Curated annotation (Swiss-Prot):
Residues annotated for dimethylallyl diphosphate binding in this entry: 41, 74, 125, 226-228, 270
Organism: Edwardsiella ictaluri (strain 93-146)
Cofactor: [4Fe-4S] cluster
Annotated gene: ispH
EC number: 1.17.7.4
Name of the protein described by the UniProt record: 4-hydroxy-3-methylbut-2-enyl diphosphate reductase
Amino acid sequence: MRILLANPRGFCAGVDRAISIVERALAIYGAPIYVRHEVVHNRFVVNDLRERGAVFIEEISEVPDGAILIFSAHGVSQAVRAEAKARHLTMLFDATCPLVTKVHMEVARASRRGTEAILIGHAGHPEVEGTMGQYSNPQGGMYLVESPQDVWQLQVKDEQNLCFMTQTTLSVDDTSEVIDALRARFPAIVGPRKDDICYATTNRQEAVRSLAVQADVVLVVGSKNSSNSNRLAELARRAGRAAYLIDSASDIDDAWLSGVGCVGVTAGASAPDVLVREVIDRLQALGGAAAQEIQGREENIVFEVPRELRIEVQQAD
């Protein structure tokens, strides 16, 4: 059985930065460090940080006075940010992915102008909640759509003063269909100058398409609440391949590999490489050959952590 690895796969720059912020805060200030929402959507990462002293909460009211608080990579609404700043916290660090912040700024600009804004995204996802929460102009409006059907049912105040933006972790193909519907329904609508779906999401989706051409079965390492990981599994299935979203090697069912000549492995942007290595080990124990990595896009983007954490770590060293 051949084992093919998607390239790129796993951690993106935003996830690397978010995890590093929590790790550095723990190293400098010690436990507990409070984090609003799971810093990234991966069970292994969250459990590891929890064991090291991170406390994951959903409400700012759960954070005691004098504590250190970190916002997750998914971002928060202006209301949550204001609530946190009103508290007597020792330090407040923002681990919001800079590419999510870009979308936040687009929404905030629309709000200031009074332009109605339409967000393409998944209802209930923390990134969507944070992005929707950047709009505060009662004279305008902020709307959420997930499908072309939502677009055709949407009613706005002024069809001549509209813009749209997207969640960063969506399916590129699905989003394109929604954008086409928006442009057909509202010809005057204005989109972002640069796509909001992030480079890592796009690259990993391209890689899984290439993987699905060669593999009989695709394993996606990622947690069930990871939007980008779910999209990878969906893409593989649309390509006609059996695809399974797994948290770890222990989730692999031997029956999935019965009669399989080639298995493809990829990982969502919040899944650490250690989990991929464990999956490879399991596949090789089941008769797999040495893993081969397919060609793909090189990624060299790095997002810096907040200056306070860089300075303090340097001083500690």
